[in-house]
Amino acid sequence: MKKLSILVTLLVFAGLLAAQQPVLSIEKTTHDFGKIKEQNGVASVTFTLTNKGNAPLVINRVHASCGCTTPTWTKEPILPGKSGTVTAAYNPQNRPGSFVKTISVFTNAGTNATVLTIKGDVIPKPAVSN
């Protein structure tokens, strides 16, 4: 009987631990810069990530689809009910025309990456005439 009550207690405790999960919520996953001028330099946007779970959310890594986009992100764990950020900085230098770039966010909230998208249209610098 004593062994059975210990086993039941351990199973209940294990179930409670398994229920402790971070839940990632992002209100907006796409940002359209619209028309940006190449001569204005880097264009940035910050995405807000909220932890709607009951365990800390950790951003393990963030990967941009090309070298023209530099991501930065919250490095410390995001506590339940709190928010963190991922900022994407797009460098339009020598990249006139339309663009669509992705930023993959890997967290402890699941095995799949959450994909953020930035897009816009780069207006080239005016040509220098002699």
Predicted regions and their residues:
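Sec-dependent N-terminal signal peptides
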Residues: 4-15
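Beta-sheet-dominated interaction scaffolds and their linkers
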Residues: 20-49, 125-130
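Surface-exposed loops/turns
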Residues: 38-39, 80, 95-96
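Hydrophobic core residues within well-ordered beta-strands of beta-rich domains
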Residues: 43-45, 84, 99, 114
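Buried hydrophobic-core signal for structured, non-transmembrane domains
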Residues: 45-51, 88, 103-106
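Surface-exposed binding patches on compact interaction domains or structured appendages
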Residues: 54-85
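Short, hydrophobic beta-strand segments
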Residues: 86-94
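Terminal connector regions
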Residues: 95-126
